[in-house]
Amino acid sequence: KTLFPYTTLFRSKTTVLRLISGLETPKSGEIKNTFRKTGFLFQENRLLENLTAMQNIAIFMDEPNEHEIIALAEKIGLSSGDLNKYPTELSGGMAKRVAFLRLLLCGCDLALLDEPFVGLDRDLRNILATMLVEKIEQQGMACILVTHDRFEAARLSREIMQLSPKGMDVQNVITLPTPLSERNSAFEETIVAREFQGIHYYE
């Protein structure tokens, strides 16, 4: 699923993910998360500064495998040397990639992603998105993604929930049955033109 806020200043989007993860408690009502393990990719990365990149990725793995980490890291432009660096030695883009790998390899069956590809170039975004799709389709990982990018929502979502500009109400739900692995840029453009026509952001 994808949460698509109508506003670029939508602060409640992160609150939704924090409530689902159990990091915050609702003031009323109840949220039941019945998944075995929930992973959270924060917008600000949240790497542990006293651990190397390699250790940050391995810390939540059920069975840490350095060879697997190195192989996946190389796909997204991280060398073995980069994996031995501490977070303060990494650029913002490198830290985001480390945080992404940590989520991908943590063994969660529910992944919560808050604007995961912001600040990354198009080629890298495509690589990470492909890796995420493979994880979803091959291993059955459930995913809730927050994004303001309409094309990203069209590529990665089976269901898009458009959120109201002044709260957490769902204004519209778009269902996309086409398998994620069969989607391409033409599909994304068609969905954006059809489903997001006339949508304006509120400041």
Task: Report each predicted region and the residues it spans.
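Conserved ABC ATPase "signature" region
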Residues: 66-82
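Helical segment within the ABC ATPase nucleotide-binding domain
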Residues: 125-139
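Catalytic Walker B motif of ABC-type/P-loop ATPase nucleotide-binding domains
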Residues: 111-115
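Conserved beta-strand-loop-alpha-helix hinge in the C-terminal portion
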Residues: 166-195
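Helix-to-loop junction immediately C-terminal to a conserved catalytic motif
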Residues: 21
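Hydrophobic anchor residue at the start of the ABC signature
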Residues: 99-100
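Short, small-residue-biased leader/transition segments that mark boundaries at the very start
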Residues: 2-9
